[in-house]
Curated annotation (Swiss-Prot):
GO biological process, one term: rRNA base methylation
Reactions that this protein is recorded to catalyse: guanosine(1516) in 16S rRNA + S-adenosyl-L-methionine = N(2)-methylguanosine(1516) in 16S rRNA + S-adenosyl-L-homocysteine + H(+)
Subcellular location: Cytoplasm
Organism encoding this protein: Pseudomonas aeruginosa (strain ATCC 15692 / DSM 22644 / CIP 104116 / JCM 14847 / LMG 12228 / 1C / PRS 101 / PAO1)
A Gene Ontology cellular-component term: cytoplasm
Residues that bind S-adenosyl-L-methionine: R109, D110, E125, R126, D179
PANTHER family according to UniProt: RIBOSOMAL RNA SMALL SUBUNIT METHYLTRANSFERASE J
Name this polypeptide is given: Ribosomal RNA small subunit methyltransferase J
Length: 261
């Protein structure tokens, strides 16, 4: 991750009914619960949950995690099921739904896709605010009758992925999935909006080689790394093979074949 001055944030309740929830989030995240004219981002607590808004005249709008409606719901219903490239990359096949550790969870979009296909997914996010957005989205998803069974297959851990993988206790994940931050070329409005949130808070993953090394040591069957299509491979061992899409590429590091369980 790049080293740079942390952006200024403050927590804001969007209604009087949300004041107590805002106070709890402010305390938990160690952020001020007051207006700050110098703040670059507002962490807003409203009836629809937690969201982060970049402040200023050119704000792209709030970012939140929503597994019930919007893009995640559309992809769940119409995204191509087990024929999706991410499904092929992690090894989803008839009768095979691998246990996946998504070690760079972000807003949980890829983890949700895998859980919707039947995989048990453990998500790890090291940036506390991004993890809070993800936790809030999962909590709301668990209250929706259609999405609750999917959310039940998702478990969230906060912390440094490389450290967690090195100290892993218990049954190892069959697949470790990595999507390190990289100067993305995806021009979609949604991705650009999210990147404007992520970059100041998270930066690029300069420790991607260490992540890959820890993932290869932990995964029992394979490691999958998502990259922009023309990006170089992560420094370290070469992948066994790759799957290429229009804008993304999945580098697969196989260790042994996935079997029906």
């Amino acid at each position: 991750m790049t080293d740079s001055a942390a952006p200024r944030l403050h927590v804001q309740a969007l209604s009087a009914d949300c004041a107590e929830a805002a106070r709890r989030w402010a305390e938990r995240l160690g952020l001020p619960l007051a207006a700050d004219d110098e703040a670059e981002f507002a962490v807003q607590v409203g009836e629809q949950g937690l969201q982060v808004l970049q402040l200023g005249a050119d704000s792209p709008g709030p970012v939140r995690v929503d597994f019930v409606e919007g893009a995640s719901a559309h992809r769940r219903k119409f995204g191509g099921g087990s024929g999706q490239m991410i499904a092929k990359a992690v090894g989803v096949q008839p009768g095979i739904r691998p246990r996946v550790l998504d070690a760079t969870a972000g807003l949980g979009r890829d983890g949700f896709v895998l859980a919707s296909l039947g995989c048990e997914v453990t998500l790890v996010e090291r940036q506390p605010l991004i993890a809070a957005l993800l936790e809030d989205g999962l909590e709301r998803a668990r209250r929706d009758p259609d999405v609750a069974p999917i959310a039940a297959r998702m478990r969230l851990l906060g912390g440094n992925s490389a450290d967690l993988m090195r100290a892993w206790d218990g049954e190892a994940p069959q697949v470790v999935y990595l999507d390190p931050m990289f100067p993305h070329r995806d021009k979609s409005a949604l991705v650009k909006k999210e990147m404007r949130l992520f970059r100041p808070l998270v930066g690029d993953d300069l420790d991607a080689p260490a992540l890959l090394q820890a993932a290869l040591a932990l995964a029992s069957h394979r490691v999958v790394v998502k990259r922009p299509r023309k990006a170089p491979i992560i420094e370290g061992p070469k992948p066994g093979y790759s799957l290429e899409g229009k804008s993304s590429r999945y580098d697969i590091y196989p260790k042994k074949a996935l079997g029906k369980g």
